[in-house]
């Protein structure tokens, strides 16, 4: 089973296309949607929904995949649920770069303060990070520096931030899922 978390643009048709591409790895791809506007509510909703989806599956190696803001959540929710995650162009600082786009971006800082201390060290090796060199939203060199000591980093030379085409990375995601 693959749980897919969309980014800030929840209604983008690209989300459906990415889910179709992920079906080459696993026929059971499930969208886990969230508001994107209310971080504290989103966290509780995602924890509950992912837990429910895991209980309904007999997959011994489920993964959670997120793009952009979805990758922010995939890392945390994956850690809290004990499953591995794939982070595609993760937004690591939504409390800074979501100002003006959501009602309470400061809630992200509050969530980070309440998260398990040094959770990345405890989650080491349990995430695969795919970063675009042509990401027009994130500073992915900085993302690589922040996450490289904890997770495997894979660079993509072509895709923009929303990463519409996963094809060249599907074999790597599949190996990571089965590892």
Swiss-Prot record:
Superkingdom is: Bacteria
What SUPFAM superfamilies does the record point to? alpha/beta-Hydrolases
Q: Which Pfam families match?
A: UPF0227
* InterPro entries for the chain: AB_hydrolase_fold (IPR029058), UPF0227 (IPR022987), UPF0227/Esterase_YqiA (IPR008886)
The family classification in the record reads: Belongs to the UPF0227 family.
UniProt protein name: UPF0227 protein Ssed_2836
Species this chain originates from? Shewanella sediminis (strain HAW-EB3)
């Amino acid at each position: 089973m693959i749980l897919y978390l969309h980014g800030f643009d929840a209604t983008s048709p690209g989300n459906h296309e990415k889910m179709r591409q992920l079906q080459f790895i696993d026929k059971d791809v499930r969208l886990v949607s969230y508001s994107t506007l209310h971080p504290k509510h989103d966290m509780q909703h995602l924890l509950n929904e992912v837990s429910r989806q895991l209980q309904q599956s007999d997959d011994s190696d489920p993964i959670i995949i997120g793009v952009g803001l979805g990758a922010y959540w995939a890392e945390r929710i994956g850690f809290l649920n004990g499953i591995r995650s794939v982070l595609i162009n993760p937004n690591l600082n939504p409390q800074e770069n979501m100002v003006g786009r959501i009602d309470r971006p400061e809630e992200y800082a509050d969530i980070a303060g309440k998260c398990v201390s040094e959770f990345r060290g405890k989650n080491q090796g349990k995430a695969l990070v795919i970063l675009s060199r042509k990401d027009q939203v994130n500073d992915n060199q900085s993302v690589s520096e922040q996450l490289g000591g904890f997770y495997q980093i894979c660079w993509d030379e072509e895709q923009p931030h929303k990463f519409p085409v996963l094809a060249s990375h599907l074999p790597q995601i599949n190996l990571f899922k089965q590892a």
